[in-house]
Amino acid sequence: MFVVIFRAKVRALDDEYAHVAARMRELALMQFGCIEFHAVSEGDSEVALSYWRDQESIRAWRAHGEHLLAQELGRARWYESYVVQVASIVRDYSWP
C-alpha cells in the first residue's frame, strides 16, 4: 500500500475550490482506486493523505484530465506552494 502526502501553503480559497476539492475526492475514491482520503487545514496550511493499493493507480490519477485542470487551478489561484510525497507503507496496524 502507498500513501500520497500533499502539503500546501494556501494563498486564498474560494467557492470553486470547495467544489473542485469535493469532485477530486469523489473521482479518486470512486474511479481511481483510492482506498481512503483525509484532509485537514489550519491557518494557511493544508495537508491531505490519500491511500492507494499500487503506484499504477497513483500515476493514472495524476494524469487524469480533470485532475490536471485542478492542479493548474491550484497553482494559479489557491496555493502559494505545495509538496507531494509518495511513500510505501511498510507496516499498518490498529487497535482495537
Residue locations for each model-derived region?
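Short S/T/G/P-rich N-terminal loop/turn motif that feeds into the first structured element of a domain
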Residues: M1-V47, Q55-A63, Y79-P96
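Sensory beta-strand/linker motifs that couple input domains to effectors
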Residues: Y51
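Short arginine-rich
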Residues: E72-G74, W78-E80
